[in-house]
Amino acid sequence: MNLPASLPKILPAGLALSLLVSGCGFQLRGAPPVSSALQPLAVDCSGDVPEQLCGSVKEQLSLGNIDLQPSEKADYVLNISNFRRERRASAITVRAAAAEYTLRQTVDIEVLTSDQVPLIAPTDLNSSETYRYDESNVLAKQREEEALQEQLYDRLAQQIIFRLAPLDRDRIDRLRQEAEQTRDQDSGQP
């Protein structure tokens, strides 16, 4: 086997670069991993949350090797509710027709332990996108809007995963302790 003369120089440099990059905590862009401390986890989507959004969250959690269980078997519950969708004209033509639309999706999330300790208080998340509207090509623009709605579902799902990522064992334990102290103070116990 005949190797190029530059290979012995490139190989150590490549190895050193990969060690340097992995050592500094570099990871590919995307959702950060959710801590294994947050399992078993239930994902509870209310009736107003589109199945595409709920399914996208569950899929991303499954890909992250998070054990998903029904609410009654889970130690933690991710509640996703109050989904809202808005479409409004953001620019108009000289003939007072819509030239651009902004699509916005909003959802509420919270994470509770099985004994109702809030790990993430109720929080609004939203995602939006603007697109040009051409009234002479309505069918294509409807398809574009549907594709954008799907992208917004995925972005919201990714935002939810980002919110779950900091919940490691230490943080969960600290939040539980704070909740216990608050309960003790409210009940008048030392």
Across the structure, where does each feature detected by a protein language model lie?
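N-terminal segment of the mature soluble domain
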Residues: 36, 40-84
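Solvent-exposed, acidic/flexible segments
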Residues: 46, 50, 54, 100-104, ...
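Sec/Tat-exported extracytoplasmic proteins
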Residues: 61-65, 111, 115, 135, ...
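C-terminal/domain-edge helix-coil "capping" segments
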Residues: 139-190
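Surface-exposed short loop/turn segments
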Residues: 79-124, 128-146
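Bacterial N-terminal signal peptides that target proteins for export
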Residues: 1-13
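C-terminal motif of bacterial Sec signal peptides marking the signal peptidase cleavage site
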Residues: 20-23
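Bacterial signal peptide processing site
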Residues: 25-28
